[in-house]
């Protein structure tokens, strides 16, 4: 994949070359999207809109730390949607990981989560965030146990994952109406990078085959159900629906 690769660390250790080789990235000086190594983290920038700033994954500080410490925890809609109850903490595959926010919330309340991300740039951002998170004295221990990244296309990987999870979580890219400034910024940068999720409808059936208990699909409240498959089971928040579908139980 072609993208502008930039190193602002001041180091001459070849980290950019290692990054490019690992994720199959090719430097393109004229690309409007840039993946930038800064002294703090790896970030994505839209060069023709510098005011948008950089997008990076941060599990340790910022909004994620606030959500972990002061958010609803088990009471969050995503936790209810995957079925967390009492001692039941399902094993989850997040097949559309994005920046890993919902996966992190589920991991923080005790679920083991495998994140799938097919875009190599987004996978590189997630990997960078995980590396920093794993090294953190406060959250590193449980984060290593509960949150992992698999770089693969969900459409193919969903048929190959073992062991099977109890829950598959899907949050496909959908054109957002007006949202908070942060989401708007991220969506603009993200959609410039990955484009619309045109094959998202194809995820529902393999997800239902893989999950032993349920599939949860996060949708904006105005969006039709994924693959136009309606379900009476949903958890509804102010702006989203978490549509719930039955999985395929394990056979003896």
UniProtKB/Swiss-Prot annotation:
| Family indicated by similarity | Belongs to the methyltransferase superfamily. RsmJ family.
Q: What does this protein do?
A: Specifically methylates the guanosine in position 1516 of 16S rRNA.
InterPro entries for this protein:
16SrRNA_methylTrfase_J (IPR007536), SAM-dependent_MTases_sf (IPR029063)
Query: Keywords of this protein's UniProt record, alphabetized?
Result: Cytoplasm, Methyltransferase, rRNA processing, S-adenosyl-L-methionine, Transferase
Q: Where in the cell is it found?
A: Cytoplasm
First-tier enzyme category under EC: transferase
Single GO molecular function: rRNA (guanine-N2-)-methyltransferase activity
EC number, as in UniProt:
2.1.1.242
Q: What is this protein called?
A: Ribosomal RNA small subunit methyltransferase J
Q: Which domain of life is it from?
A: Bacteria
Q: Which residues are recorded as binding S-adenosyl-L-methionine?
A: 101-102, 117-118, 153-154, 171
CDD domains associated with the record? AdoMet_MTases
Q: Which reaction does it catalyse?
A: guanosine(1516) in 16S rRNA + S-adenosyl-L-methionine = N(2)-methylguanosine(1516) in 16S rRNA + S-adenosyl-L-homocysteine + H(+)
Q: Spell out the GO cellular component terms annotated for this protein, sorted alphabetically and separated by semicolons.
A: cytoplasm
Pfam families registered for this protein in UniProt: SAM_MT
